[in-house]
A protein has these predicted regions:
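P-loop NTP-binding/switch modules centered on Walker-like glycine-rich loops
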Residues: 198-202, 206-287
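ABC ATPase NBD Q-loop/coupling interface
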Residues: 86-110, 147
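Helix-to-loop junction immediately C-terminal to a conserved catalytic motif
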Residues: 77
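Short catalytic/signature loops enriched in Gly
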Residues: 2-17, 31-37, 42, 97, ...
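A short, proline-enriched helix->beta-strand linker immediately N-terminal to the Walker B motif
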Residues: 191-195
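Conserved ABC ATPase "signature" region
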Residues: 92-96, 149-167, 276-277
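Conserved ABC ATPase signature
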Residues: 172-176, 180
């Protein structure tokens, strides 16, 4: 297992990041029909994505359905194999980075202690044949981190942290509400004290009344346990208050990234402005004209140049000539747009 330092990749942050993603690509081949299928192209689900996740930060990854958010985080954690690129992770917190993309299946196993995932669906992500105690204890058992009384103590402690009673250990998932099931999933993800957690649409399947409770719980756990999150979301209004920074994705690329208040207050990329304008306003007396949405880009047949150009109200002749790079447009604010200044 090779070890890297910040000298091995260009820094996008002043302080050494916890995770540095560089030129990450995940392509899915398109094959023709027939007796002998031939590759005819690629679906570029994730296309040269680069960003840093800072220590004790919540980075929001937002965009429309199909833009590549979930594929990005699943590729980083090697639920999907890389097509190319790197994801440098400081697993031990000692400045020695490992690259998720080059690790073997055996080398990935100890990394799972430090990097975990909270899944979207609290109903299908829990084994209905296991008790709550068994579900939360399973990571500790697999990684041989605790047994006997110590195992029971850590499970009880984790259940209390997520707002569940230890006596629930003997019950099965079907006995709980959606919000309680998601708390069980959170307990399972955090019981090994990871440093980095992906929350993939972790509240989108819950009732609106429960979403705020789970979001606030995740924010409290971040402070208590020193966590760093990548939080995948499409409902900006629900999760805005826990994001430290926001990265906006479109057609497999990050088109803008900035601190939360900066991005919401001064969006630069036309797609970011469209996304923010499309968010519902909780005031029936406020009316506004919504921008024309247009057709979402096909990741298997992207147009030349900027993928958003066919939908962009500000598109010029140069937009179809080349793919814009993510460049600084302000302090800690980056955008991939030829008209950004």
């Amino acid at each position: 297992m090779n070890a890297y330092s910040t000298d091995d990749f260009s820094a996008l942050s002043e302080a050494p990041p916890l995770l540095a993603v560089r030129d990450l690509c995940k392509f899915f081949p398109i094959r023709s029909r027939g007796v002998i299928p031939k590759k005819t192209g690629d679906v570029k689900a994730v296309n040269r994505v680069s960003f840093d996740l800072r220590r004790n930060e919540t980075l929001g990854l937002v965009g429309e359905s199909g833009c590549g958010k979930s594929t990005t985080v699943r590729t980083i954690l090697r639920a999907l194999d890389f097509t190319s690129g790197h994801a440098y992770f400081d697993a031990a917190g000692d400045g020695r980075y490992v690259d998720f993309g080059e690790l073997t299946a055996r080398e990935l196993i100890p990394l799972r202690r430090s990097a975990q995932m909270i899944f979207q669906d609290p109903f299908s992500s829990l084994n209905p044949r296991m008790t709550v105690g068994g579900i939360v204890a399973e990571p500790l058992v697999i990684h041989r981190m605790a047994k006997g009384a110590e195992l029971e103590r850590r499970v009880d402690e984790m259940l209390l942290k997520v707002g569940l009673k230890p006596e629930y250990k003997t019950r099965y998932p079907h006995a709980f509400s959606g919000g309680q099931r998601q708390r069980i999933g959170i307990a399972r993800a955090l019981v090994m004290n990871p440093r980095f957690v992906v929350a993939d649409e972790a509240v989108s399947a819950l009732d609106v009344s429960v979403q705020a409770q789970v979001i606030n719980l995740l924010d409290d756990l971040k402070r208590d346990m020193g966590l760093s999150y990548i939080f995948v979301a499409h409902d900006l209004g629900v999760v805005r208050h826990i994001f430290d920074r926001v990265a906006v994705m479109y057609a497999g690329r990050i088109v803008e990234i900035a601190p939360t208040e900066e991005l919401f207050g001064h969006p630069v990329h036309p797609y970011t402005r469209l996304l923010l304008a499309s968010a519902p306003v909780p005031d029936p007396d406020r009316r506004r004209e919504l921008p024309k949405a247009g057709e979402v880009a096909d990741a298997g047949n992207l147009p030349p140049g900027c993928a958003f150009a066919p939908r962009c109200p500000e598109a010029g002749k140069g937009c179809a000539a080349e793919v814009p790079e993510l460049l600084p447009v302000g302090p800690d604010h980056f955008a991939a747009c030829t008209s950004a200044g």
